[in-house]
Amino acid sequence: MEKTKYVFIGARGHERVMSSVLESNHDELLAVFDANPALHDLDGVKSEGEYKQNIHPEAKLIIAIGDNAVREQLSHNIKHTFGSAIHAKAVVDRLTNLGVGVQIVHGAVVNRGSSIGKHTIINTNATVDHDCQVGDFVHVAPGATICGGVKIGNGTLVGANATILPNCTIGKNVRIGAGAVVTKSIPDNVLAVGVPAKIIQHG
């Protein structure tokens, strides 16, 4: 079986996670782009410095950066064929809809009837249950649980080990704190923390 070839933008922690995803599928990482010279040639992968469109144009590009706003900005500015990557030990039901650039890592679960927007990260051991709608440029952090029927707006961060209970709607650009339990819907552009989750910051 022919290997899929990739290049990454980003040479920080999330790049290492995504390198592991490629290895699980026996795919090939050709190069990493990052403007910070201190991060070049991490884990033996050749760094090309800042992104250049003419380097490995045949490869699929993944924005291996955890920050939602940065992923969105780069996706609008880069002219390259984007790829998605799913770890061999993730579970993604066949009746799901995945956008371009999706990153689903070790132990993650995406259940039947759910949709995951473009350039969204479903991180280690996170669960998206049935019939959820997860927007673009979302990050569901390690261990988070999204129960059935939840809707999550673009650019939202669901913190590590947070839980969103069934049928809640989470707005755009929301930050859900680590370990929070969301029991009701949350509007756009807020920070919510605690058990049960309460809004502590707007904007």
Model regions: which residues?
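Short, Lys/Arg-enriched, disordered terminal segments
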Residues: 1-5, 57, 201-203
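Structural signal for interior beta-strand "rungs" in well-ordered beta-sheet cores
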Residues: 85-193, 197-200
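Generic structural signal for conserved hydrophobic packing positions in ordered secondary structure
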Residues: 10, 61, 82, 129-130
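Short amphipathic alpha-helical segments
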Residues: 19-22, 45, 73-77, 116, ...
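Short alpha-helical
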Residues: 13-14, 69-70, 181
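Alpha-helical elements of the RecA-like P-loop NTPase motor core of helicases
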Residues: 16-20, 72, 184, 201
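Phosphate-bearing ligand-interacting subdomains
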Residues: 37-93
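Hydrophobic, well-ordered beta-alpha structural blocks that scaffold small-molecule cofactor pockets
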Residues: 1-52
